[in-house]
Amino acid sequence: MSRIKLLLEYDGSNYHGFQLQKNANTVQAELEKAIYRLSGERATIVCAGRTDAGVHAWGQVVAFDSCSTIPGDRWAYALNSQLPEDIQVLESQETRAEFNPRFDALKKCYGYLIYRQKKKATFYRHYALCNTEPLKLEAMQEAAEILKGRQNFRSFCASGSSARTFEREIFHCRLSEKGPCLLLHIAADGFLYNMVRIITGTLLEVGKGKYPPQHLREIIASQDRTRAGPTAPPQGLYLLQVFYPEDSK
């Protein structure tokens, strides 16, 4: 029995998220069907981040166990021959038997894309939040800096979370201009349910002048979800990269 580690990218537009769901098409379901077609095994996929419906990934990490004779570094080629075009395995390798993509992660990086033009966003509608209002970028960046460090982020967690603690450490949170878009890049040791989308919605409120950057301190201190901004839609969110202890060796 070998544990196989995969690095994936996928367009989440046509999926009801990553995780298996009854009577719904998911990324995990497509992967497990492809594994079965190749090896006859009913593998169970474990992932680094269970992305929601409509959310995309450039650097999702998953693992599964297999008794197949397919070499670890050939799983990528084999799976890509069976997967739909909106899911691609970028790399594959055999890894240590105890490797867990979710719990072994040291840091996860997400990006949120905001399209900011007055005209209709025909080609961005499935891949970015479309904003037509002027945004104060300096104010948004000042607010983003306040989020850095280890803090209680309960105000940025959607209801229904199973988290035991609301403390997380944000290593960096910055905004950059990418053509007609604004990219929020955020890295942390972990994220709460809808945390990045709520942070994005809150920073947009700052950018629109709804409240000043320093108001973020009050939102954090309140530990009250109703004090933060709205949850940004899923299509602008991307899982960019996941870091593990072995990556620094």
UniProtKB/Swiss-Prot annotation:
Subunit (UniProt): Homodimer.
Name the record gives this protein: tRNA pseudouridine synthase A
EC number: 5.4.99.12
Enzymatic reactions: uridine(38/39/40) in tRNA = pseudouridine(38/39/40) in tRNA
tRNA processing keyword on record: yes
A Pfam family reported for this protein in Swiss-Prot or TrEMBL: PseudoU_synth_1
Gene3D superfamilies to which the protein is assigned, alphabetical: Pseudouridine synthase I, catalytic domain, C-terminal subdomain, Pseudouridine synthase I, catalytic domain, N-terminal subdomain
BP terms from Gene Ontology: tRNA pseudouridine synthesis
Residues reported to bind substrate: 110
Active site residues of this protein: 52 (nucleophile)
Alphabetical UniProt keywords: Isomerase, tRNA processing
GO molecular function ontology, one term from the record: tRNA pseudouridine(38-40) synthase activity
Annotated family: Belongs to the tRNA pseudouridine synthase TruA family.
PANTHER family: PSEUDOURIDYLATE SYNTHASE (PTHR11142), TRNA PSEUDOURIDINE SYNTHASE-LIKE 1 (PTHR11142:SF0)
